[in-house]
């Protein structure tokens, strides 16, 4: 179980971290309820304007992440899956870890204003806060592997060039999605 310090550390974080955290919450909820994450955002925006509700306003950066991740979901999932070990599938990853990876990979690929190191560190922090003790390490390895080939991925490729570091560390990393299709 996470310590009280770890659970409340997000309160000391900046607005971007809180927006990422809210995006993870929304993507997680959308997958668990099998609904469109953009619809959840729209509902939360309406609810936050009503008197007598405890629903907080949705930060604009959360809206940007959620709408971007929803629009690019297939590509994000392909890219994440391309970096998993052969015996792992995207569905095998915990739902919360998928949400964290989708937010972090979206930032890596589609928001060049966020430094790569920041997107990686924030993803690892979210995994530390939300997930198991082993999740931060494999989230870090996967995001680092993607960051090493960021120019190819930003140009539209989903085939990783290399991922030996994460694989050598024993984390679930796959050589290439092209190998799976042959």
From Swiss-Prot:
Keywords: RNA-binding, Transcription, Transcription antitermination, Transcription regulation. One of its GO terms (molecular function) is RNA binding. SUPFAM superfamilies: NusB-like. Disulfide bonds: none annotated. GO terms for cellular component: cytosol. Residues 159-182 are annotated as: Disordered. The keyword Ligase does not apply. Involved in transcription antitermination. Required for transcription of ribosomal RNA (rRNA) genes. Binds specifically to the boxA antiterminator sequence of the ribosomal RNA (rrn) operons. PANTHER family: ANTITERMINATION NUSB DOMAIN-CONTAINING PROTEIN (PTHR11078:SF3), N UTILIZATION SUBSTANCE PROTEIN B-RELATED (PTHR11078). Belongs to the NusB family. This is Transcription antitermination protein NusB. It comes from Corynebacterium diphtheriae (strain ATCC 700971 / NCTC 13129 / Biotype gravis).
